[in-house]
């Protein structure tokens, strides 16, 4: 084992633009490569964009177990592997704390995804380390967390809003909300991105017993706020010449909401379970006749943007978040009856499906590609490199 791998500080590597490159440390995700969710994908895509632009990018990665911090690289991104041997939110909190303490040994700019442990970021503020924080959605308001977790999130949100040099909102409505937490000059809206999918192998789709173009997809966490029951009820209200494919872990034996969804499903509803392999998920999206999106809360949802990037016609829950993301060319619902009538009208019209698909790609190209999103991050982060953050500016923010 190298000396660098045995110690907790990568002292043999240049930092703080010592080699002429701007430096950013990415915290708040499980790390790269992305294997979990939206924040991990954002960290990976933004990190790679910055790397191509000539930056040195250091990503903190959570690994199971105990021992010393180790270092390696993935596709040119430098990884700081932080071992944690606690499960769930306790492990995540410990991981965040370790990352903050490690990164605080340097003067490098930090890009932080999320505010779940925002109170810990006060240490970075004390050390006068510049921080740009992606504030996610209004997580504390989500009923799924319960009162105790909501209060923890609320407190951490307030701390992050106060100590961050700059805040990123991933949706205009989140941006407006953050204006109540920080000066407008301190908030920038940068949406979530996706890769465009122009072709995909049919084999993974057929291997699942599905016919390309003859099924709809619904990909989300199976919880009530994602309107799965309404979508399944609306689809199942009458026979259709399509399948409805659900991705996600459903356990009707132990979860009452899951049981309701399964009981409402017709024989044309297919439960595939939780699938994370992009070599399967991407073809499933691309060859889907339509994407159903029931999210009622949050900002720019990754699954919705990915559907637009695949050219999927979209039927989404009617709210301000989804309407901004998907645009005027898609369809919206509020009730199960709305779902049924919308599917009746759309699935029977190849012309409308084609128009919605074209509108989805048009919306994607209007500002949702990772190239566009990555460049917006670069321009913002460049303003907060340590050499450009004066004492006056740091104090003001």
What do these predicted ranges mean?
Residues 101-104, 150-167:
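Membrane-proximal helix-turn-helix segments that form the acceptor-binding/catalytic region
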Residues 53, 351-386:
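A charged, aromatic-enriched C-terminal amphipathic alpha-helix characteristic of glycosyltransferases
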Residues 24-27, 207-239, 245:
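Conserved donor-binding/catalytic core segment of Leloir-type glycosyltransferases
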């Amino acid at each position: 084992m190298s000396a660098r791998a045995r110690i907790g500080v990568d002292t043999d590597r240049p930092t703080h633009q010592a080699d002429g490159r701007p430096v950013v440390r990415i915290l708040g995700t499980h790390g790269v490569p992305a294997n979990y969710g939206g924040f991990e994908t954002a960290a990976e895509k933004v990190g790679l964009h910055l790397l191509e632009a000539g930056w040195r990018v250091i990503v903190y990665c959570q690994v199971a177990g105990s021992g010393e911090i180790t270092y390696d690289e993935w596709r040119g991104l430098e990884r700081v592997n932080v071992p944690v041997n606690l499960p769930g939110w306790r492990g995540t909190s410990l991981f965040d704390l370790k990352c903050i303490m490690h990164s605080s040994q340097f003067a490098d700019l930090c890009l932080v995804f999320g505010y779940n442990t925002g109170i810990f970021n006060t240490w970075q503020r004390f050390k006068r380390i510049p921080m740009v924080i992606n504030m996610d959605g209004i997580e504390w308001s989500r009923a799924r967390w319960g009162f105790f977790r909501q209060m923890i999130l609320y407190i951490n949100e307030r701390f992050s809003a106060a100590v961050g040099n700059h805040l990123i909102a991933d949706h205009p409505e989140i941006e407006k909300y953050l204006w109540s937490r920080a000066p407008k000059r301190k908030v920038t809206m940068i949406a979530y991105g996706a890769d465009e999918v122009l072709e995909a192998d049919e084999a993974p789709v057929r291997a699942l017993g599905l016919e390309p173009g003859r099924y709809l997809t619904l990909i989300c966490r199976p919880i009530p706020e994602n309107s799965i029951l309404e979508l399944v009820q609306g689809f199942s209200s009458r026979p259709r010449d399509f399948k409805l494919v659900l991705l996600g872990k459903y356990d009707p034996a132990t979860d009452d909401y899951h049981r309701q969804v399964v009981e409402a499903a017709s024989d044309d509803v297919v439960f595939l379970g939780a699938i994370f392999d992009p070599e399967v998920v991407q073809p499933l999206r691309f060859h889907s006749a339509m994407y159903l999106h029931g999210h009622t809360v949050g900002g720019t949802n990754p699954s919705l943007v990915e559907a637009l990037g695949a050219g999927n016609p979209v039927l989404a829950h009617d709210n301000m978040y989804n309407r901004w993301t998907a645009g005027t060319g898609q369809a919206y619902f509020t009730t199960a009856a709305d779902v049924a009538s919308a599917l009746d009208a759309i699935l029977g019209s190849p012309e409308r499906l084609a128009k919605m698909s074209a509108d989805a790609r048009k919306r994607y190209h209007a500002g949702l590609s990772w190239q566009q999103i990555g460049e917006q991050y670069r321009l913002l982060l460049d303003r907060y490199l340590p050499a450009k953050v004066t004492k006056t500016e740091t104090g003001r923010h």
